[in-house]
Amino acid sequence: MKVKFTMLVTAMIVLSLGTLHAQTPSKPAGGFDRLKVLAGEWQGTDESGKPVTSTFRLVSNDTALEETFQSDKDKEMVTMYTPDGSRVALTHYCSKGNQPKMESPAVTATADEFAFTFTGATNLASPEDTHLHHLVLQIDDAEHFTETWTIHEKGHDTKRVFKFTRRK
């Protein structure tokens, strides 16, 4: 009887430890940790010198990075960056009403360039409809970063470059 009771207690302890481990959130990918340095407010210009702003903030217990982008040309847009194993994934909530999804290759905590490639979209009637198809985010230094967008429309790609400086 004592042996059965001891085995039962041991099994319960082992099972509870497994449950405890399963509830512990996994550590975000190193590349995602690097993106966290962007938290804050940024002022920038597009390739023609027109003003743009971007605000980054950590949300969901620091497991997602929200970017809110505003230009004179476009209505406000939001991009959510999240860890996906050793990669970083994003969903761009475009002012056109579609939501392109992209992913970077595996990146490390010391990476300064994140090249996101299109993996799919929601609310995109046709792949030829206007949408953000690639995004390269380059962290130049603690006070500067650059975003290069590739917009795909009717079989043609157009690049837009935005250079940002941290607001003080």
Q: Which residues fall in each region the model found?
A:
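Hydrophobic small-molecule pocket/channel-lining residues, especially in calycin-type beta-barrels
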Residues: 23-168
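Polar low-complexity intrinsically disordered regions
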Residues: 1, 19-21
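Bacterial N-terminal signal peptides that target proteins for export
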Residues: 1-9
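Bacterial N-terminal signal peptides
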Residues: 9-18
